Amino acid sequence: MDVSLDGKVALVTGAGPNIGSGIALALSRYGAKVACNDLVPDAAKAAVRRIERNGGIGLALSGDVSVEADVLANIAAVLEAWGRIDIVVNNAAWLHTNHILEEDLASFNRAITIAVNGNFLFTKHAAVAMIERDIRGSIVSILSSNAWQGASGFIAYATHKGGLANFVRAAAMDLAPYGIRVNSFTPAAPRPDNPELLARWRAEGRTELRPPRPPRPDRPSWWRETGTYDVRGNIPMGEPATPTDIGHCIAWLSSDYARLITGCDFVVDGGARAKYWAYTPDADAAAGPVPLIPLDATELADG
């Protein structure tokens, strides 16, 4: 099976520098032209540089996904540049962490507005563009493990991610008569693999798989004592996914091979979500890392 997105145009929101950038690169490596949206213009430009460095074609877009005028301007820019939109990945969100007893309404509303309005606006207006051009497109919303399970300190994030899980199912039903598929993807603490991001972290003296968290005396010991955590011990396959792993899956989900898949959620997490909560994987029995099919030429050069 040779997955190809040749001739297709994709738009990825929240395109930098971690999950969004990885998805954008993957769609490009599988043949799509990719428009990269981010609230921070430099982040969108960095995602496009990564695409172009690997031989792809990208377009940098800046805009607030929760503002309808910005969304319409982004879609118009893609249509003007390439004449069509086949794929949309709704990745933009605000990872705002706070305890329910500490959260304020303004911050709660902001987190909800960015994620929910952003998914609604891009899904609606991209679908209109697809229908007008008789395109049977693919729309993917990026969720989180917090959509399905509770974690202390993520009240706003869990609320909007959980809500989006059902938004996807409802949107899938609305758009099915037009041949437009709507699905979701649930990351689970992915390990960053963007060479530019990792280089910046090294320059800042970071050595962990994930960036340090601020000290919080009210949080569990793994947070309180080190400010970081390592999730590998809770993953049955012993290794967290990367944005590259996520990108491979979303590229396939956006291809014609997935033509009848809609209203579904996909997860690439080494078995983390399927794991019984009390089960701790035996690290000594782990088979070891499965070889990764890389997408970034810089990663190939470094390896």
Q: Where does each model-flagged region fall?
A:
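Canonical Rossmann dinucleotide-binding motif of NAD(H)/NADP(H)-dependent dehydrogenases/reductases
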Residues: 3-35
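C-terminal substrate-recognition "lid" of short-chain dehydrogenase/reductases
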Residues: 4, 120, 181, 237-268, ...
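Active-site helix of classical SDR
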Residues: 123, 160, 168
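Alpha-helical segment proximal to the catalytic Tyr-Lys
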Residues: 128, 132, 173-177, 259
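Short C-terminal tail/terminal secondary-structure segment
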Residues: 251, 262-303
